[in-house]
Regions:
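Membrane-embedded, hydrophobic transmembrane alpha-helices
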Residues: 1-111, 367, 373-376, 399, ...
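Start-transfer (signal-anchor) and selected internal transmembrane alpha helices
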Residues: 69-141, 233, 467-477, 481-482, ...
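Active-site lumenal/periplasmic loops and adjacent helix-entry segments of GT-C-fold
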Residues: 124-301, 336-340, 651-652, 679
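Transmembrane alpha-helical segments
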Residues: 128-132, 245, 249, 334, ...
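Membrane-interface alpha helices of multi-pass inner-membrane proteins
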Residues: 286-289, 321-335, 347, 438-440
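Hydrophobic, aromatic-rich transmembrane alpha-helices
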Residues: 304-312, 346-347, 464-479, 539-559, ...
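Signature aromatic-anchored transmembrane alpha helix within multi-pass, membrane-resident enzymes
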Residues: 354, 402-403, 410, 425-439, ...
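Extracytoplasmic
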Residues: 607, 611-778
Length: 778
């Protein structure tokens, strides 16, 4: 039942989730206790491992026992066995425990003091929780169910997956929106909720609970990645703000009270999502992480994995690459776009690792978040803090110079100075070359649509050249160094990724993505008329400006580590990977992670070079604070307005009569019955009951590459001419008919004809449920 099994069901579901999460954190702590990770990072990695186990272990047993309680009990037993084995094999020595930070309360206080991002995370997490609470089928006083603006669409699809997987228990699962078709959408983001729903949680609780853990993993994974990359809390803090509180310059189009009022009353007329003004770079929290579960759960794996892999490359330990490979291999059926983005990131990082030996080595404090008492004690000598480059509370010019030198040249060990100089030059101009290339392509495309027709070919050629260059560097590396060094790091990682990912890709992804509308030419993402640079300037806003400056403000070392965004942007701007061109933003936003990191570091460098001088006087401080406030306003105001719109949005999703009808359907029908309904995206039958329908909404099925058109036509025929469509009722094995104002408003329903094929068995207001007569199937 979508209402759940009361307190017992809720406790069982929460307990099941907590057991996997807690055991995963235990495993992470045991496996990483001897590594130079903070406990925060260890528990983050462990929580990711726990969620991966919750997503995958029931499915492994579901092949034999279907998606049943038996499969889930066996999955839990497997997790317990894994915990016992890890606890038995992995011992944390007393020395390693003593060397570890956060053993005392003072260390935790220092953690919060040196990483103020916790405050922003808490505020943003509260916003996320409130939106989920008010948007997830909230029961109204009249019995109807309500939602918000961003969740009005996709949430219905996710509900249909969650309820059908749990109720029908067939594995591999099929589309309840199009029976007979294998569910090839990355459904592990929903099966995790199906597990909790199966335990007895209400649909609302099963939907929300895993998302709360996932958003914290996204927040922490992003911050750890930037912190490891730059080794500075302030850079990670600014990057976090630029990414999660993004807004662009769309606010300039809302220049009077009437337009501002429409932000909070119209459907999708916000400063970050306004088609008429070509505003397409949506607010991350509102339009990516709240409504798009695959993106949320994909990033919950991807961001911590990137931070973890960063460290693995630096220390070159086989165990870390093994752990990273297993996690990466689990990604395709959680979020395919994240898996593709990870592949491009790893390709660039591998190239950098082959050419510059110690590029990923960062100060030890970065890995411990500057909280270890030992590292902190060593940073103070003769009354000055050398680690932060501050003397008596002031940033010294010598510390800045030494930091810049070490950042740009200290990571070139093992590579020739000529190679380093050449790579330093190209990385500083790569962004401008790319912008010039795409601007010229846009001008050519406007006259003859060359890029729209041949973008895929251009992309393939570019990627092929990159792969050839990577192969060349690989050969040179193997000629000069031991192959074992590479085989037991990147080699193991690649093998494990292929072992775990290929079965998923062949079983689910490739079969559905083989249509003509998937991998194809498409130029310039969602730009509808603006000049190339202007489009991204007004959509990205301050991060784009700072990115332009970063080429000359940021060290070459940091520019190189951030280079994956160049490859991601190149690929995503020339080809589309599914029927909805707009969905390339799921790749572009991963590229934006690196853009925000570089933009944040550029801002820090600007302050240290020019702003620190003015900080010494009261007037100077006021000026710096005012300038910082203005920059924050420009960067975030569009995002805040969009978040405010989401905060107050409220729409009826299912009427009270529809909800009551669904309760009746759950009680009186079997999970495998097929019900005839309209193809509306918010049809309550597949979402609340998990029953299969003849055809779901084209807004879902088309973008999944499914051939639904005949089913859609047959649905209309069965409503408009039921007496002459008896063969269709038999063909689709329709057991029940659902009739409401949705169906009356969509089709010219022949009610008299329906009486010839079915009988009314339930009715309330405008909603009725009909049972197809047995004689139809004779």
């Amino acid at each position: 039942m979508f209402d759940g099994n009361g307190v017992t069901g809720a406790v069982l579901a929460v307990g099941y989730y907590a057991l996997f999460l807690g055991s995963g954190m235990y495993i992470g702590r045991k496996l990483l206790c001897k590594e130079r990770y903070s406990i925060v990072m260890q528990y983050l990695v462990g929580s990711v491992a726990g969620v991966l186990a919750l997503q995958w272990f029931p499915l492994l047993f579901a092949f034999a026992f279907n998606f049943s309680m038996t499969a889930h009990v066996l999955a839990l037993l497997l997790q317990v066995v894994l915990c016992v084995l890890v606890g038995w094999r992995c011992h944390c020595s007393e020395f390693s425990l003593q060397q570890h930070p956060y053993r005392k309360v003072t260390e935790w206080k220092r953690l919060f003091r040196e990483n103020p991002v916790w405050i922003l995370m808490a505020v943003t997490f509260a916003f996320f929780c409130y939106c989920l609470y008010t948007h997830t089928i909230v029961g109204n006083a009249d019995g109807s169910m309500h939602t918000g603006q961003s969740t009005y669409g996709d949430m219905n699809m996710h509900f249909s997956f969650i309820t059908s997987i749990a109720n029908q228990q067939t594995f591999p699962p099929e589309y309840s929106l199009l029976p007979g078709h294998k569910l090839s959408y990355p459904f592990l983001c929903d099966s995790v909720s199906s597990s909790l729903y199966l335990m007895g949680a209400s649909l609302r609780l099963a939907y929300v609970l895993p998302m709360l853990g996932a958003i914290l993993q996204v927040f922490m994974g992003f911050y750890c990645l930037i912190k490891y990359w730059f080794g500075r809390s302030v850079t990670a803090l600014i990057a976090w703000i630029l990414f999660f509180w993004n807004g662009g310059l769309g606010f300039v189009y809302f220049d009077n009270a009437e337009k501002v009022h429409k932000i909070f009353t119209e459907f999708y007329m916000t400063p970050t999502n306004y088609l008429d003004k070509n505003l397409r770079w949506v607010q991350v929290m509102v339009d990516m992480l709240i409504p798009q579960r695959a993106t949320l759960f994909g990033w919950a794996i991807l961001f911590p994995l990137l931070a973890f892999l960063f460290r693995a490359i630096a220390v070159r330990k086989k165990k870390l690459f093994v752990m990273a490979g297993v996690a990466a291999g689990a990604l395709p059926m959680i979020h395919t776009h994240s898996f593709l983005a990870l592949g491009m990131i790893c390709a660039v990082w591998l190239l950098l690792d082959l050419t510059e030996n110690s590029l990923f080595v960062t100060g030890k404090a970065a890995y411990g978040w500057k909280a270890a008492s030992a590292s902190r004690g060593s940073s103070r000598r003769n009354g000055k803090v050398t680690a932060s480059g501050r003397r008596n509370g002031k940033v010294t010019s010598s510390s800045r110079r030494s930091a810049n030198v070490s950042a740009s040249t200290g990571n070139r060990r093992g590579s020739s100075s000529a190679d380093a100089t050449a790579s330093d030059s190209w990385i500083r101009y790569a962004l401008y070359i790319g912008l010039a290339f795409f601007s010229v392509m846009q001008m050519i495309n406007r006259s003859n649509e060359f890029a729209d027709k041949h973008g895929l070919v251009i992309m393939i050629i570019g990627v092929a050249l990159f792969v050839l260059f990577l192969g060349y560097k690989l050969v040179r590396y193997l000629q000069n160094r031991s192959w074992k060094r590479l085989a037991f790091t990147w080699g193991i990682f690649l093998i494990l990724v292929l072992i775990f990912a290929l079965p998923q890709l062949f079983m689910w992804t490739f079969s559905q993505a083989s249509g003509d509308n998937f991998v194809r030419s498409h130029f310039n993402w969602s730009n509808n008329g603006d000049q190339y640079i202007i489009f991204y300037l007004k959509n990205l806003g301050l991060p784009f400006v700072l990115l332009l400056l970063s080429s000359f403000m940021v060290s070459a070392r940091n520019l190189k580590i951030g280079a994956p965004y160049l490859l991601i942007w190149f690929v995503a701007e020339l080809a589309a990977f599914q029927p909805n061109d707009y969905d390339n933003n799921k790749l572009l936003f991963v590229g934006a992670v690196f853009i925000c990191g570089l933009a944040a570091d550029a801002l820090v460098q600007i302050y240290e070079r020019y702003g620190a001088v003015y900080w010494r006087s009261a007037i100077g401080k006021a000026g710096v604070v005012l300038l910082g406030a203005c920059l924050l306003f420009v960067s975030a105001i569009s995002g805040f307005l969009t978040m405010g719109r989401e905060w107050v949005s409220d729409y009826e999703l299912y009427t009270a009569s529809a909800v009551k009808a669904c309760r009746y359907i759950e009680d009186e029908t079997t999970p495998w019955d097929v019900i005839l309904t309209s193809t509306a995206h918010n049809s309550p039958v597949p979402t609340l009951t998990g029953r299969s329908i003849v055809c779901g909404s084209s807004s879902f099925l088309y973008y999944h590459g499914l051939n639904y058109q005949q089913n859609e036509q047959d649905v209309e025929t069965m409503y408009t001419s039921p007496a002459s469509a008896k063969e269709l009722f038999r063909e689709y094995d329709v057991n029940y008919i659902y009739l409401s104002n949705q169906e009356y408003g969509t089709y010219n329903v022949d009610v008299n004809g329906l009486y010839e094929v079915a009988d009314v068995i339930w009715q309330k207001d405008d909603v009725s449920v009909w049972k197809v007569k047995d004689e139809i199937f004779e």
